[in-house]
Structure formats: structure tokens, C-alpha cells
Regions:
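Phosphate-backbone binding and catalysis cores of DNA-processing enzymes
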Residues: 1-140
Length: 140
């Protein structure tokens, strides 16, 4: 079997949800569903027109209220994790990455034991903050 260049492009665009325009108005449930389809959504703070995650969702859903992303996170449908970079991921994927959470030293230079020891006090403060205030976003 041979795939033409045009077919390969269309296959890639379709897999990313970019081949066709949205057929209906977006709903709140489309936010976690779209991120699930992509596997993750990088949290990028670049803000020329809008923050990157909002533009990525707009390109797939069309016009939608930007607060839906925060609402999906607050409802526990999404979680933040360092998957590739800082990313939003479907909470249902937690079981797929838990092994990485348990072995952060295998995630590269950012998680070396020496770094963890050097920042032990800050890490303890962060854990205490989460303990006192409950689940929080990285922005908190």
C-alpha cells in the first residue's frame, strides 16, 4: 500500500482534528474531549493574541468561552502534568503516566535527585500549600 503525500497530509490533519471546520457550536464537554483526542495540550504562556492553549482549542472547536478550559480543569476532567512540557491532560490518563510520577529521575535533567535535594524546602512548602488549600493549579 502506498499513501500519497496529499493523503498523508490529510490523515495527519484529520488525526489532529484540523481537517474539517467544526460542524456545530462548541459545548463545554468538547474541551476535555478535544484534549483527549490530542492526548495533551501544552500549557504555553506565549500571549500575542491569546495564550496558546486557547488558540489550539479555537482552531479545533471554533468560537468558545475561554473560561471553559479553566472550568474543565476545576471539575477534575483535566489535570496538569509535565508530559512533554507543562500540559493539560485528560484525568482519565492518570493511570497511564503514574509510573513516570513515581520515577521522576528518569524524566531527564529537570528531575535529577540533586535538584530535588537543592529545592527540598520549596518542595515542602508547595506540598504544604496543596495540603492546606486542596488541589490547585500551577498558576496558584
Amino acid at each position: 500500500p502506498h499513501l500519497s503525500l496529499a493523503d498523508a497530509r490529510n490523515l495527519h490533519l484529520a488525526a489532529q482534528g484540523l481537517l474539517n471546520k467544526p460542524r456545530r457550536r462548541a459545548s463545554l464537554e468538547d474541551i476535555p474531549a478535544t484534549i483527549s483526542r490530542m492526548s495533551l495540550l501544552q500549557i504555553d504562556t506565549i500571549n500575542i493574541v491569546a495564550r496558546s492553549p486557547y488558540l489550539v482549542l479555537f482552531s479545533r472547536l471554533g468560537n468558545y468561552p475561554a473560561q471553559w478550559l479553566d472550568e474543565s480543569l476545576a471539575r477534575g476532567e483535566l489535570m496538569e502534568y509535565w508530559a512533554h512540557e507543562a500540559c493539560f491532560m485528560p484525568r482519565s490518563d492518570f493511570r497511564l503516566i503514574r509510573h513516570r510520577m513515581l520515577a521522576p529521575e528518569k524524566m531527564g535533567w529537570k528531575y535529577k535527585d540533586a535538584w530535588m535535594q537543592e529545592h527540598e524546602a520549596e518542595i515542602a512548602q508547595l506540598i504544604q500549600h496543596i495540603h492546606d488549600k486542596g488541589p490547585v493549579r500551577s498558576a496558584d
